[in-house]
């Protein structure tokens, strides 16, 4: 099975769907919103081509479910808020928003929500139906999606940790895994494994910046939010807990060790410094803003029961990783993996050690020399 076929969230609206298990991401989006507003404010000051008539925006790696339109709502509200501040300087423009993700993404679950979303925009923002146009642009964000110099603003949240492929060099010539007992590049991984993952991330992120800089107008903006490394040595991110759960099944004899050793997630969690260095080395963008922050897995969860919280966290992580796990380990063992995941989560949550570190970075495309 091709990797792109399983790099998706759980679709539909069932109990294990991403639509029902993505409340954590809403907390991250709330943290991003003030930065988004400032990014839009700077964008509208830049006097880009045709921006007074139609602002062209894309959400790269939009996923599915209500969070997709929550991002769209935040973008529209930010544009309208800044436009109201400018009053006569800027008439309310049409907004054209492209939702991007891989072809297997459940776009239909988003499209079903559009009629009510448009009505809500009209009621709350005064935006008449037709003044905000939302469509899909399926495909990998590591490849060209739009014509040259056609976009004003690109947004992406919680996507850049996904690599275009599993790094090469994780298996020796004799077929032995160099990442035995692990499913990604963690702090405990061997240096060759860490290097292989960093090299793949550097290649992919450089490609991402180069391709999308070509799609943006000069002075166009890009706002990226991704998971990043923290300084806490004893913290446990969700992939660490997932790795521990799978290892439990190996120890208990429910899963062959070779099955674990042959599995590596196409995921890399960079440091803020690595992201910054790659942006500077690629050279197409100026860094306007960079911030790191952490959000506990159970933040915003009101029920004060560690086991219920742990099940909630397990369901959230399952909605993200089940398709790729099921393609390798089989669907039958998925409930067992996340039952053990919840047990590990219940141990770290009371200690405040279960969280994601996050990075927000705001970028502006540098002008061509001929534009200066």
From Swiss-Prot:
It is an enzyme of class 2 (transferase). The gene is XMT1. Homodimer. Mg(2+) binds at residues 179, 261, 263-264. This is 7-methylxanthosine synthase 1. Binds 1 Mg(2+) ion per subunit. Its cofactor is Mg(2+). Its EC number is 2.1.1.158.
């Amino acid at each position: 099975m091709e990797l792109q076929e399983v790099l998706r969230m759980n679709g539909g609206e069932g109990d294990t769907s991403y639509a029902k298990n993505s409340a954590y991401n809403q907390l991250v989006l709330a943290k991003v919103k003030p930065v988004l507003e400032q990014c839009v404010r700077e964008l509208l000051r830049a006097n880009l081509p045709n921006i007074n008539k139609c602002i062209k925006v894309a959400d790269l790696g939009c996923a599915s479910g209500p969070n997709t339109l929550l991002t769209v709502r935040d973008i529209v509200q930010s544009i309208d808020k800044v436009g109201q501040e400018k009053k006569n300087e800027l008439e309310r423009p049409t907004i054209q928003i492209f939702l991007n993700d891989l072809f297997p993404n459940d776009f239909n679950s988003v499209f079903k929500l559009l009629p009510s979303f448009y009505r809500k925009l009209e009621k709350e923002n005064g935006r008449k139906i037709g003044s905000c146009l939302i469509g899909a642009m399926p495909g990998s964000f590591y490849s060209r999606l739009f014509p040259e110099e056609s976009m004003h603003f690109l947004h992406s949240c919680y996507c850049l940790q996904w690599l275009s492929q599993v790094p090469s060099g994780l298996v020796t010539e004799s077929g032995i895994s160099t990442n035995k007992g692990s499913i990604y590049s963690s702090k405990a991984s061997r240096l060759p494994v860490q290097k292989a993952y960093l090299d793949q991330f550097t290649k992919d992120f450089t490609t991402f910046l180069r391709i999308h800089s070509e799609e943006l107008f000069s002075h166009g903006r890009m706002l990226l939010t991704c998971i990043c490394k923290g300084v806490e040595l004893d913290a446990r991110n969700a992939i660490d807990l997932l790795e521990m759960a799978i290892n439990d099944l190996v120890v208990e004899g429910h899963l062959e060790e070779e099955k674990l050793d042959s599995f590596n997630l196409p995921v890399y969690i960079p440091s803020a410094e690595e992201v910054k260095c790659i942006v500077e080395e690629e050279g197409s963008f100026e860094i306007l803003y960079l911030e790191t922050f952490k959000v506990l897995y159970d933040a915003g969860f009101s029920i004060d029961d560690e086991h219920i919280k742990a099940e909630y966290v397990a369901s959230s992580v399952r909605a993200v990783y089940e398709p790729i796990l099921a393609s390798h380990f089989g669907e039958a063992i998925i409930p067992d993996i996340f039952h053990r995941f919840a047990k590990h989560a219940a141990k770290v949550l009371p200690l405040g050690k279960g969280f994601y570190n996050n990075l927000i970075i705001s970028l502006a495309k540098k002008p061509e020399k001929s534009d200066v």
